[in-house]
């Protein structure tokens, strides 16, 4: 059964107790930020725009800030842990491998957002504080979410620097691609333990005033061997969308079970990146060495019958293994990378939307079977 709740953005904004401007950054804790920055530059077409490290006074960590459109990644490695934050990052990489430590959200008032969140049950991991330099002032605060992930609340209204105070502008690592690869971060998906999905959905409902956008349970989100459940929470403007998955009992180990085992607990499973031209994006990324999940040719034999006309011909979708889905609002095109590190944990989705604000419900079976084939190769099904 699938339940869908549609929003009326204008009404939602008027009553929004926790207004947001959008995703500020996805912050990764990684073993080698310099190499990771090179990978995301060459493989994903991201552009280095800012840096913080020993050369400009940061003795404990090195961080590389990469952007493409409004999508921003921050890749951070510990050089020599000396503070609780440095030890936390080092322990995070040791336990989880490379992974997302922070889904930072831009807000118009970080102090008010933090106060509202704490009043409604969130755990603070950083009280509101200011960072200043010649570019202005940024106000930040942070709250905990599932696993060891946090949400830093960022108010950069009075700031025009390259990222945050303490960072300096940096030149791209490689020649920027001829075409912008991505437009924005579309959504960020979290995996949580069995029986805890509703707990975390309730957390976002209560702490951030987010509402339930979609729900996927039962046959919609199962194969012959594995199953999971998923609910999507979003702010009133739909700028910030967080699907939350949990495993369901089935014959074999699901992709969520595999993630939880190898990540060592709950965390961010994948980041969806919005593109205006998925064909160009996938061709460019494939040429740069990014591996995508495979889709059997049989998927495309009847695709045109139930999806209808799309911007991209079915033959091109078949060639590139891109999935398509249609709902009452329009259609979307999507494809998923394989995990981008040796642990079968974090991966990416590329999505092109044409009216649809869905998540590819019609593709779930094909997608999960593709993931199961990869699990079987790894001996984890």
UniProtKB/Swiss-Prot annotation:
Residues 22-156, 184-338 form the VOC domain. One of its GO terms (biological process) is tyrosine catabolic process. Binds 1 Fe cation per subunit. Its cofactor is Fe cation. Fe cation binds at residues 187, 270, 349. GO terms for molecular function: 4-hydroxyphenylpyruvate dioxygenase activity; metal ion binding. Belongs to the 4HPPD family. This is 4-hydroxyphenylpyruvate dioxygenase.
């Amino acid at each position: 059964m699938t339940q869908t709740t549609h929003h009326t953005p204008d009404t939602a904004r008027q009553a929004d107790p926790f207004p947001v401007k959008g995703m500020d950054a996805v912050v990764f804790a990684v073993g080698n930020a310099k190499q990771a920055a090179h990978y995301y530059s060459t493989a994903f077409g991201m552009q280095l725009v800012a840096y913080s490290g020993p050369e400009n006074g940061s003795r404990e960590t090195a961080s590389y800030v990469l952007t493409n459109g409004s999508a921003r990644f921050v890749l951070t490695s510990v050089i020599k842990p000396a503070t609780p934050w440095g030890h936390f990052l080092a322990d995070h990489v040791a336990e989880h491998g490379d992974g997302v430590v922070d889904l930072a959200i831009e807000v118009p008032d970080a102090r008010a957002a933090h106060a509202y969140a704490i009043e409604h049950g969130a755990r603070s991991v950083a009280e509101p504080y200011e960072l200043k330099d010649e570019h202005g002032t940024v106000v930040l605060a942070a709250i905990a979410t599932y696993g060891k992930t946090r949400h830093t609340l960022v108010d950069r209204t009075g700031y025009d620097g390259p990222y945050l105070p303490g960072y300096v502008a940096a030149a791209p690592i490689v020649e920027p691609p001829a075409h912008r690869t991505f437009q924005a971060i579309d959504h960020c998906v979290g995996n949580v333990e069995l029986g805890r999905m509703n707990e975390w959905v309730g957390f976002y409902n209560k702490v951030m005033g987010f509402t339930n956008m979609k729900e996927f349970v039962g046959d919609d989100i199962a194969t012959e061997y594995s199953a999971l459940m998923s609910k999507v929470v979003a702010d009133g403007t739909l700028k910030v969308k967080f699907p939350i998955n949990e495993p369901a009992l089935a014959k074999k180990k699901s992709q969520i079970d595999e993630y939880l085992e190898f990540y060592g607990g709950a965390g961010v499973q994948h980041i969806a990146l919005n593109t205006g031209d998925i064909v160009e994006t996938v061709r460019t990324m494939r040429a740069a060495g990014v591996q995508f999940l495979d889709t059997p040719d049989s998927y495309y034999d009847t695709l045109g019958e139930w999806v209808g006309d799309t911007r991209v011909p079915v033959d091109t979708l078949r060639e590139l293994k891109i999935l398509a889905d249609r709902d009452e609002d329009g259609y979307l095109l999507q494809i998923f990378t394989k995990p981008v590190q040796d642990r079968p944990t974090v991966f990416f989705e590329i999505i092109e939307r044409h009216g649809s604000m869905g998540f590819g419900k019609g593709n779930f079976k094909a997608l999960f079977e593709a993931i199961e084939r990869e699990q079987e190769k790894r001996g984890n099904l």
